[in-house]
Amino acid sequence: RCKPCFTTDPQMSKKCADCCGGKGKGKCYGPQCLC
């Protein structure tokens, strides 16, 4: 499960992608990173 995400974090989309295993994967939705 990915860490909580915060839309205020400019690095968040990269963190989401890294957590989800690749570029273009993972979205910051609500407080959670969804893969």
Swiss-Prot record:
Chief place of localization: secreted
Record's function text: Toxin with unknown function in healthy organisms. On glioma cells, interacts with chloride channels (probably ClC-3/CLCN3) and MMP2 at the surface of glioma cells. This complex is then internalized via caveolae, thus inhibiting the chloride channels necessary for cell shrinkage and tumor propagation.
GO molecular function, one term: chloride channel regulator activity
A GO cellular component entry from the record: extracellular region
Record comment regarding domains: The presence of a 'disulfide through disulfide knot' structurally defines this protein as a knottin.
Family (UniProt): Belongs to the short scorpion toxin superfamily. Chloride channel inhibitor family.
Organism: Hottentotta tamulus sindicus (Scorpion)
Cysteine-cysteine disulfides: 2-19, 5-28, 16-33, 20-35
Keyword line: Chloride channel impairing toxin, Disulfide bond, Ion channel impairing toxin, Knottin, Secreted, Toxin, Voltage-gated chloride channel impairing toxin
Known tissue expression: Expressed by the venom gland.
Signal peptide: none
Any Pfam family the entry gives: Toxin_5
Name of protein: Chlorotoxin-like peptide Bs 8
Subcellular location: Secreted
The organism's place on the tree of life at top rank: Eukaryota
